[in-house]
Regions:
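A short gly/proline-enriched turn/hairpin at secondary-structure junctions
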Residues: 64-71
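Surface-exposed, charged secondary-structure patches
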Residues: 80-119
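Short, well-ordered alpha-helical segments enriched in acidic and aromatic residues
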Residues: 50-61
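Short, low-complexity N-terminal intrinsically disordered segments enriched in polar/charged residues
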Residues: 4, 8, 20-44
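Solvent-exposed, acidic/flexible segments
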Residues: 31-35, 47, 55, 71-75
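Stable alpha-helical elements in mature extracytoplasmic
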Residues: 34, 38, 42, 50, ...
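Hydrophobic h-region of N-terminal signal peptides that target proteins for export
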Residues: 11-19
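Short beta-strand edge/turn micro-motifs at domain boundaries
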Residues: 119-141
């Protein structure tokens, strides 16, 4: 009987050690609540044209597209470009039409951004990297 108990405890210990050893820093754990929570904050920053707030969630490099500008930009430069976009096209409304996961660490959002008589399709992706969510693609087309 003691051999059976020993085998059960050994199996549990091996399972726990394997689970901990193969954990990834790119995936959220139950102790960290910041994961998958920036979506509403990003949406609010876009609705209120708050470029500084939006930039808090930018990855160190952002693939950005707005009228007249397209490319990969550093976080600070991307903030200035978005601030200029919001200045030229202040939001009258913004809504998310679709969202989903394109991979275990990437969530995409597709929305409609209206500014006066202009309507833009807004697309952005949020990735989980180093235990943080970050915007790595943002497009207003």
């Amino acid at each position: 009987m003691t051999k059976a108990i020993y085998i059960v405890f050994l199996s549990i210990a091996i399972f726990c050690m394997t689970t901990l050893a193969h954990g990834s820093k790119n995936y959220p754990d139950s102790l960290t609540q910041e994961f998958y929570d920036i979506g509403p904050s990003v949406q609010n920053a876009i609705k209120t044209a708050n470029a500084a707030k939006l930039a808090q969630y930018f990855n160190s490099s952002v693939n950005l597209q707005v009228p007249g500008k397209s490319g990969s930009f550093g976080k600070t430069q991307a903030e200035f470009i978005i601030k200029d976009f919001f200045s030229n096209f202040p939001p009258s409304s913004f809504s998310i039409n679709n969202q989903g996961k394109s991979s275990a660490t990437t969530t995409y959002y597709i929305g409609t951004y209206k500014s006066g008589s202009k309507t833009f399709r807004c697309y952005y992706t949020i990735i989980v990297f180093d235990n943080k969510e970050r915007i790595n693609v943002l497009k207003f087309e």
